[in-house]
Amino acid sequence: MKIIDQMKDEKLGSAILYNFTLGYGKPVPMELYNYVLPFIFHEAFRANVLQATSFRNCIELCYKEDYRCLDAFKAAIIQDEMVTSKSLGLALVNRWLSFSVTDEKMSGTAHESTVMMLNEPYRLGEWFKEMSIEEIEECLVIERERIIILETNSIGQDMDLSKYDRLGDVTVYPEVEEEEIPILIQDATIVVVNKTVLNEDNLKNARKLKLICLFATGYNNIDLNYCRRHGIMVANVKGYSTPSVAQHTFSLLFYLYEKLPFYDHYVKSGRYSRDTSFTHFEKYFNEIEGKTWGIVGLGDIGQRVATIATAFGANVIYYSTSGRHDDARYERVDFDTLLERSDVISIHAPLNKATYHLFDQTAFAKMKETAYLINVARGAIIVEEDLAKALVDGKIAGAGLDVLEQEPMAKNNPLLAIRNSMRLVITPHIAWASVESRTRCVEEVYLNIESFIEGKGRNIIGHDLQ
């Protein structure tokens, strides 16, 4: 059928209509011929027709590749009428087809000929034999999902979301105010958010809503109880940020551990240019090799950090906040033991009742004064006032934070009083946000929506899609 890509005329059309008539297996109503060439001339339809299980399934496959195909089919049914008419005339002249009138209705019948066998129109004939024109046209009507994507600035302006247009009618809002949410989502069937809070107050008028997708793993901003009561599915994304968060864990540590703020300032202030020695190590630093690295939460990210820390020669121990993780490669200890033995502690646990304010003044008092604390998990795992005091009092050597209990950071956060960047470094929740990580996140959400539309369900939280 590659010849169709170069030709769209009555000679080829007559061969297509002849094969269609053979597949139909009985006299073809004349008006039905107008529905043949528009589909066979369509590249995606031809590519799918032999593998599809039905005409509707073939349309769905085409729609999945390009939702605009429905409009293309409808337009072609009108535009190709002349080609169809000429093709039928040529088939009549060549005696491939003949036409007769029965009960005041004209129909076409195929005769023996040397016309090349074309499988695609033959299959279409087999399908149409069991369908009325009304049923054919019904297959060309697919109700599109109404997809609302909120706070797209949180995923990055460099991310291309145009692919989502394949899934439905998409409206994007870079930023939203809380009071706007009920109006923006009231007609949505699918809503995508990152950190926007969705609860009964702003969901109660979204009566068409079927799915909430998160550009995130955590879902504590979604009222799951309300969603369950109203049949709204919630889907998150998992594992997309593991490489990025693990990388940022070490970025925060190295910044502190090797006293990089001091040495960068030393050079740029001109002191190095005035020095008489080729080296200057006024602020002493150590190697990771041989040190004990304590991990709180040995999930995917915790395991990735453990692997890298081991490669640096560290001795890894871990505390499982859930009690579910048991990894024979590393020593499992209780929380107090981890605090007492660790030279570096990195937090990779979820926020829950067991981890809320886990690191308080009691915990800091048990840590080594030379220890560093890294938190790339959830801000509320640390009591920030207690951490600030521990840093000021020298209870620990330093802390690297990518998360805070309140985000954006509160203006009166006690950590802002610590100006020494060798003791404390804070980044604005960016550990997850490498270009590659955000690209994976966007793709994962796309797959979650696609799977839901297909009735399969993917990454559904709390209950399965039946």
Predicted regions: what is each one?
Residues 113-142:
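Glycine-rich, aromatic-bearing surface loops/beta-hairpins
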Residues 238-292:
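Phosphate-binding beta-alpha-beta segment of Rossmann-like dinucleotide-binding domains, i.e.
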Residues 89-103:
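A short, conserved structural fragment
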Residues 143-188:
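N-terminal glycine-/charge-rich "phosphate-binding" loop or analogous flexible N-terminal tail
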Residues 199-202, 321-414:
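Rossmann-like adenosine-cofactor binding region
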Residues 234, 370, 376-466:
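Rossmann-like dinucleotide-binding domain for NAD(H)/NADP(H)
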Residues 78-93:
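Short amphipathic alpha-helical interaction segments
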Residues 301:
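Hydrophobic/small residue at the entry helix of a nucleotide-binding pocket
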